[in-house]
Design a protein with these regions (language model features):
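Glycine/threonine-rich beta-strand-loop-alpha-helix active-site module
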Residues: 90-194
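Active-site pocket-lining segment
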Residues: 291-354
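C-terminal charged capping/lid subdomain of soluble metabolic enzymes
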Residues: 2-8, 326-403
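Glycine-rich phosphate/pyrophosphate-binding beta-alpha loops
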Residues: 157, 265-297, 375-378
Length: 403
């Protein structure tokens, strides 16, 4: 990256960091069981709810316990279950039409990050009916209060239940972009481990490593605060302590509970401190090839950490020691190597590969431009790179025979 652009990026990031204490960040109020929602809706005078989820969650009956409580208390609801991985503008518009048609007055995002992000985007379109989602992409362009929004994560990974971001894919161009504004933070989050116990091992692994990526990128960036560092360290330790237990035994309710807390803490960290190039590259792959976001993050994370080199040794040392991966007596480089090796070991245990056969060489310049546009100047990354410099990651992610 040339010096002028690099200077602009760092000045932008510095200004944003200075503004953090004055911005209206908040955390959602947390419940630990879906049964608590009936009292909330009765108290708020909510009559009709739109539940945004996906077909798999509905098919496997994950909604049933909550719906039983709603039926018992005569709370009306309608279900939109067409959300796809990497939710599209089409999903958002279909769900919005159902909300308006049925005269709903609250929204529940029930599922992984896709369902919760879709719910946030629907809320934004309800709040600003004359403005398209593409006009809201970027930062601080929603402004208006959303309908009452409740997030119920069925995966421990995205942290969307506590963040100000919604990531949406344009149905026509397949460009994936983020909408970032404070009204998108859900009013309530339900961290109920019982809705996560049927999550298969593969998704337990990739969504858990998604949360790890949130925590690590938030911690190594240049816009951390005392609070975000605390949340990122807690999340990192909880993940290393519990992800293998949840992967090996999906019925381990305590491990599931701790992973939900880790995801929430990681979300609290990155919603203020942001992420980095791992996410930017992952989003560009998800938009074009529909590669699941958690899988992309898990695959990319160690290669980017290695590439940052000595600029992050001290911070990785701090994470490694806190998580019990390294000793305080280790020097920074040794501890950083141990931390990255632990991530690689995690990938191997979960049978996550190092490449994606979907990547086409001719797509790389466009994909890297999208990653550059997402990350710069917003993400306070340890090492700045432009689109051309980011191309190396796509080549590293290609199978050898495809290069």
């Amino acid at each position: 990256m040339n010096k002028c652009k690099a200077a602009y990026c760092r000045i932008f990031q510095k200004c944003f960091k200075i503004a953090i204490p004055f911005l209206p960040y908040r955390h959602p109020e947390v419940f630990y069981s879906t049964s608590k929602l009936t009292g909330l809706f009765e108290e708020k005078g909510i009559d009709t709810i739109l539940i945004i989820t996906d077909a798999g969650i509905r098919k496997f009956g994950l909604l049933d316990r909550m719906l039983m409580h709603f039926d018992h208390h005569n709370i009306h609801y309608f279900i939109y279950d067409k959300t796809v991985a990497n939710p599209t503008t089409t999903n958002v518009e279909e769900a919005r039409e159902l909300y308006l048609e049925k005269h709903c007055d609250a929204i529940i995002g029930f599922g992984g990050g896709s369902s919760i992000d879709c719910a946030k985007a629907v809320g934004a379109r309800i709040a600003k009916p004359k403005q398209s989602l593409s006009k809201m992409k970027g930062i601080l362009k929603v402004h208006k209060k959303l309908p009452l929004l409740v997030a119920i994560p069925t995966t421990a990974g995205t942290g969307s239940e506590t963040t100000l971001a919604a990531v949406i894919t344009d149905a026509q161009t397949r460009h994936k972009y983020a909408i970032n504004d404070f009204p998108l933070i859900p009013a309530y989050a339900v961290l109920d481990p019982k809705v996560t116990i049927s999550l298969p091992p593969s998704l337990t692994a990739t969504t858990g490593m998604d949360a790890l990526t949130h925590a690590v990128e938030a911690y190594i960036g240049g816009s951390t605060t005392r609070h975000t560092r605390k949340y990122a360290k807690k999340a990192t330790k909880l993940i290393f302590d519990n992800i293998y237990k949840a992967y090996d035994d999906g019925q381990n309710i305590e491990a599931r509970k701790e992973m939900l807390k880790a995801s929430f803490f990681a979300g609290c960290a990155f919603t203020k401190s942001y992420v980095g190039y791992v996410h930017a590259v992952a989003h560009s792959l998800g938009g074009k090839y529909n590669i699941p976001h958690g899988l992309a993050n898990a695959t990319i994370l160690p290669m980017v950490l290695e590439d940052y080199g000595s600029t992050i040794y001290k911070k990785l040392y701090q994470l490694a020691v806190y998580a019990g991966i390294a000793d305080e007596s280790d020097d920074y480089e040794v501890a950083a190597d141990k931390f990255i090796s632990a991530i690689k070991d995690m990938k191997k245990y979960f049978q996550i590969g190092d490449t994606f056969s979907e990547i086409q060489k001719e797509d790389i310049p466009e994909r890297s431009r999208y990653a550059d546009k997402e990350a710069n100047p917003l993400y306070p990354v340890p090492v700045l790179m432009n689109a051309k410099e980011l191309e190396k990651y796509y080549y590293m992610l290609m199978p050898e025979e495809e290069k």
